[in-house]
């Protein structure tokens, strides 16, 4: 299957290159490198809580090819595609044969602009895509990410901003089931691998672009998840040892961004609320996936994110992400969960192409159980890195970095790392690029 996927992707690429009318848009991303720790191989932990710099040990890439297929009288068709590649970088012979390397079909869609009467700027799309993801780069987290196969319309102008509406499929797989409760228990038992997959559809509505004052802009939206069992799947799902009936769930997001021209600083404030199967995202740094492995009928949660960058001088700049989240009853035995995370990255640019980073991150997480007990987790990371870069701004790529990192799992995680240690030191080299 994976070989067929790669062959299909190559064929699509060659077909687009053979089309003489329009140029091919080529973009992508990759990261890779090598590292080692003071106790065995490089070890990573909690990068969405403590930061990603010097805390990644994989090889990951995305190759995106797109092409305009039609342009006439204000109407256009645009084809977009993307494949991803992942491996743990452990050796040279990483192939799909033994799942050492993984290939994924991430995007394959068609976008039609100018076809809706009265809405010349609106784009209607169908296929598979990354749908308007909202990213926090230094912790590698997408806090608003409803992606998959679907269809929608975007850039429907209204006032200062525009609406977007989408229907996206994001099924849950490999759920626990009790086939004895199925209307067709015999078939369920013999074909459990099909009965334990649950169809989940998302309806997503957003409005972006309202500017409440000079230098500010906003975005608001709701993502509504709808589990969709077949009749033969009703009453068969289990979670945490008991019957589980997945409920419709929502996640509401509002964000305010502001550019402080005097400081040349971008700052963002994000407020989110979610319930039932989506509530756990508020304390797991998730972006909207539905939890079908926990009893969460009464779950509710919220999250506050503050992120931004601040140039101090021509040579010094800072970037940070602060997250606080709280969720109640996201599993059968949990009363509440709280998360507090803080990550900051500082940069000193020696020249246009030479810069040094210092990144520090810390988090605390607490589970309060219905039995009256508590479980606490914490961690810290400190990274010093020197980089060869294409320019001074912090997010300029390509970049090649030499790093040393100290990770501490906290008193609660004394056996977290190799040799039953609570901390580790990593050093290595990593390359990263996007284009």
Swiss-Prot record:
List UniProt keywords, sorted A-Z: Cell outer membrane, Ion transport, Membrane, Porin, Signal, Sugar transport, Transmembrane, Transmembrane beta strand, Transport
Name of a matching Pfam family:
LamB
Q: How does it sit in the membrane?
A: Multi-pass membrane protein
Catalytic activity field: beta-maltose(in) = beta-maltose(out)
Enumerate the residues marked as the site Greasy slide, important in sugar transport. 29, 60, 434
The conditions that induce or repress this protein are given as:
By maltose.
Against InterPro entries, the record matches this protein to: G_neg_Bact_CarbUptk_Porin, Maltoporin, Porin_LamB, Porin_LamB_sf
Q: Which GO terms describe its biological process?
A: monoatomic ion transport
What is the role of this chain?
Answer: Involved in the transport of maltose and maltodextrins.
Give the family per the record: Belongs to the porin LamB (TC 1.B.3) family.
PANTHER family noted in UniProt: CRYPTIC OUTER MEMBRANE PORIN BGLH-RELATED
This chain's protein is named Maltoporin
Naturally occurring in which organism (per UniProt):
Pectobacterium atrosepticum (strain SCRI 1043 / ATCC BAA-672) (Erwinia carotovora subsp. atroseptica)
Give the gene that encodes this protein.
lamB
